[in-house]
Amino acid sequence: MAHILGIDLGTTNSCMAVIEGGQPVVIPNAEGFRTTPSVVAFTKTGERLVGHAAKRQAITNPERTIISIKRDMGTNKRIKIDDKEYSPEEISAMILMKLKADAEAYLGEKITQAVITVPAYFTDSQRQATKNAGRIAGLEVLRIINEPTAAALAYGLDKEGHQKIMVYDLGGGTFDVSILEIGDGVIEVLATSGNNRLGGDDFDQRIIDYIADEFMKEHGIDLRQDKVALQRLKDAAERAKIELSSALQTTINLPFITADANGPKHIDMVLTRAKFEELIKDLVEKTREPVETALSDAKLTPEQIDKVILVGGSTRIPYVQEFVKKLTGKEPFKGINPDECVAIGAAIQAGVLAGQVKDILLLDVTPLSLGIETLGGVFTKIIERNTTIPTRKSQIFTTAVDGQTQVEIHVLQGERPLAKDNKTLGRFILDGIPPAPRGVPQIEVTFDIDANGIVHVSAKDLGTGREQKITITSQTHLSEEEIQRAIKEAEMYAEQDRKRKELIEARNRADSIIYQTEKLLRELGDKMTETEKQQIESKLKALKDVMNGEDKEQIERAIDELTKSFYDVSTRLYQQGYTASGPQGGPNPGGGQSGPDGNVNTDYKVY
């Protein structure tokens, strides 16, 4: 059975896992790391980089490096690179394509299906955008599940007995808290709350502002106005934050950060953990209200919670751990990896869908109330927040004026009493209502939320049976035409990436045979005939001339010609008793071993 990939598509880092032998296994990326930076970059030559490669070059290429795109999912934002604009879905798809390709290389099979996690507090449009990103990346997204729920799956897979747990999930860009009940293979979400604009990125920004403000006081230069300097500050801030989780102070050293008429300027300062905690105190405090709301909605007190589980890289910060301990009165559980448990949970859900994991039932909830605008601009809720999904609910409405023949259904998501203060999910018209006094027509509005948390709405005139229905798509949602275009471009990029990789591999082989040939000439050149030496030197030069070009076939032809001459000569020398560390005992050109047919079986790495 083909694997279904479980993906934690994070703000700062992403992770993937599958079920192997009935157990979830985290898949390392091509570079060997278990998490992949959610970073995309475009070089000035048009090459696309994703993950560690993109993050490494961010300092020298800040304007063409895209970070934290998850925060813009479900919005109208577009990222312009050269003459092309990219939607957040397309950038996220590039990250997903990298994960998909690395998983395929690791598993040795094609991946076509996935379960992707999202913050519990993601709106409908953000969930739709995530599903579209998967589609653009060539993945059928079987299920969208909430990150805290996935973490609970990872925690509760082998647990016996009944427990009420709180998942406190503070990641790079979002905060979620969920209250769940686990027992007898059932994982039921009782309540969820959160903040989609709060996370480790905000902590980094506080450090950046502190460093920049101190530098401004001393030198009168605002480093935030210099994009390269700002990117160096971002890197330094992230490193400092991580180091302060285990150290009481850290040194921030950035030589030649800028220059003025008096010469170059440097940063060399100490940031203590106490100062860092002072900088982020109010941000951490913002997590209090969602925690209290979730407890209230679940009708529980902190004392009734059996375990508090920390999820997300930002929960490694000691101040956050202490805050959670004081807030809940419990020592947080640290027995699961906060960076990997969400992907593991996604893989478990994938295993449930594939029938590989038995006896687990997941009951999730909708994070925000759903309803419509009614007379006077009032928001009338049809489905309350924290309702278990999938669900379907209906309510009867009527007309507001005499003779009204059509009604506009304005679909909203939120908790505020007035429609204007909530998020619009969509609008549609039900027409063809027979003229009648107001209050007479009976219009049934039905909300249907599927297991992905995606909303479907219908309105039906009970008098005529006339009905209109839509699957909600926000104004920022990509059209089908745009999705198809993005899919084609993604396939084109995948083809370009494949060709680029093949070109790099050809250059690597060329570099290896050049090294071995030059070594042979140094060690045994005096044992060759003049004709042999000239022939090898000629073909060596020909390969050097083309190896940095863009024509892979030309490079491979030059490699083949040089390899043939190399082996003709080295075989003759070997038979005469001369040795060199290519033909006898040592590695062959390309780092492999000679096969029985005399061809070279290469084994190399591409960096």
UniProtKB/Swiss-Prot annotation:
Q: What does its record list under induction?
A: By stress conditions e.g. heat shock.
The record ties this protein, via CDD domains, to: ASKHA_NBD_HSP70_DnaK-like
NCBIfam families xref list: PRK00290.1, prok_dnaK
What is the protein name stated in its UniProt record? Chaperone protein DnaK
List every position bearing Phosphothreonine.
174
Indicate the segments annotated as coiled coil, or none if absent: none
**Keyword annotations for this protein?**
ATP-binding, Chaperone, Nucleotide-binding, Phosphoprotein, Stress response
So where does this one cross the membrane? none
Q: Which InterPro entries match?
A: ATPase_NBD, Chaperone_DnaK, Heat_shock_70_CS, HSP70_C_sf, HSP70_peptide-bd_sf, Hsp_70_fam
HAMAP family for the chain: DnaK (MF_00332)
Superkingdom, taxonomy of origin: Bacteria
Q: Which family does it belong to?
A: Belongs to the heat shock protein 70 family.
Q: Where is the signal peptide?
A: none
Q: Where is this region: Disordered?
A: 577-607
Q: Which organism is it from?
A: Caldicellulosiruptor bescii (strain ATCC BAA-1888 / DSM 6725 / KCTC 15123 / Z-1320) (Anaerocellum thermophilum)
Output compositional bias ranges, type Gly residues. 583-595
Q: Tell me, in a sentence or two, what this protein's role is.
A: Acts as a chaperone.
SUPFAM superfamilies under this entry?
A: Actin-like ATPase domain, Heat shock protein 70kD (HSP70), C-terminal subdomain, Heat shock protein 70kD (HSP70), peptide-binding domain
Q: Which PROSITE patterns match?
A: HSP70_1 (PS00297), HSP70_2 (PS00329), HSP70_3 (PS01036)
Q: Which GO terms describe its molecular function?
A: ATP binding; ATP-dependent protein folding chaperone; unfolded protein binding
